[in-house]
């Protein structure tokens, strides 16, 4: 992993302890933030499109942003939850660009860390567990503002704890796209820096010092899709994120599409 830690900009939206008795059952949840769980006792399941994940005590679980999933709980179940939002103004999204393990066993440090995170962020507990009560535009904006209004010392300590928890998953994470060619890496960096602008394929070919046809073939070989498809998909993802997390009318979200 060659990314700089300066590229990782994480904000805490919610953190707390949840106690359920067969009432943690929600369907077709999909959010612009990442969910991290530490299971204390009991069992439950998270149902993904490609299968079901059993939640076990003393294990950590990570649910990536924009991943459609459902929850199923038929008995007593206690867990800590942490909702993390990766600042979309960052040049790149590490949580977005990497595949993380869904489940890892907990060590001796994770529980004290997440308990401390709850202790210094008491106002970030969820009033109720129903995702529709907190996974909406006004609530997300309030939570982001609340995060930024905390004391500086709490921000520093909280960020350090979140980094330690995410680091456990980063250890076995793999990039969604493994790019080995430096020319394509430069192009991807340029696309991310200019995602809100109109991106011209000819200019990308010039950055790679290749002819347009050669560039398109090499890009598809390295990334697995054409430059045009990649750029437009990234623009759609960014637009969806802004729509959900910013109080901006749809007509004002003008993200130019790529041009051949």
Question: Can you describe what each PLM-predicted range is?
Answer:
Residues 42, 58-59, 82, 215, ...:
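Short hydrophobic/aromatic patches on the structural cores and recognition surfaces of FHA
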Residues 51, 126, 174-177, 195-196, ...:
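Short, flexible helix-adjacent loops and helix caps
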Residues 185-205, 210, 217-259:
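Terminal helix-turn-helix DNA-binding modules in bacterial transcription factors
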């Amino acid at each position: 992993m060659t990314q700089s830690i300066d590229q990782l900009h994480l904000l805490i939206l919610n953190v707390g302890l949840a106690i359920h008795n067969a009432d943690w059952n929600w369907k077709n949840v999909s959010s612009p933030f990442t969910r991290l769980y530490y299971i204390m006792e009991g069992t439950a399941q998270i149902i993904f499109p490609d299968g079901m994940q059993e939640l076990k005590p003393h294990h950590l679980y990570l649910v990536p942003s924009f991943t459609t999933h459902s929850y199923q709980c038929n008995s007593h179940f206690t867990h800590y939850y942490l909702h993390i939002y990766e600042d979309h103004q960052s040049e790149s999204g590490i949580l977005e660009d990497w595949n993380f393990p869904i489940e890892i066993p907990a060590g001796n440090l994770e529980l004290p860390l997440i308990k401390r995170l709850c202790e210094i962020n008491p106002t970030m507990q969820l009033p109720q567990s129903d995702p529709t009560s907190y996974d909406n535009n006004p609530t997300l904006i309030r939570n982001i503002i609340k995060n930024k209004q905390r004391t500086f010392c709490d921000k520093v300590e909280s960020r350090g704890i979140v980094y330690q928890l995410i680091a456990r998953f980063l250890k076995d994470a793999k990039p969604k796209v493994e790019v080995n060619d430096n020319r394509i890496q430069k192009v991807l960096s340029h696309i991310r820096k200019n995602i809100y602008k109109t991106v011209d394929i000819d200019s990308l070919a010039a950055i790679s010092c290749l002819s347009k046809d050669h560039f398109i073939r090499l890009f598809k070989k390295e990334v697995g899709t054409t430059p045009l498809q990649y750029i437009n998909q990234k623009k759609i993802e960014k637009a969806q994120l802004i729509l959900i997390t910013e109080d901006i009318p749809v007509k004002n979200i003008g993200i130019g599409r790529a041009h051949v």
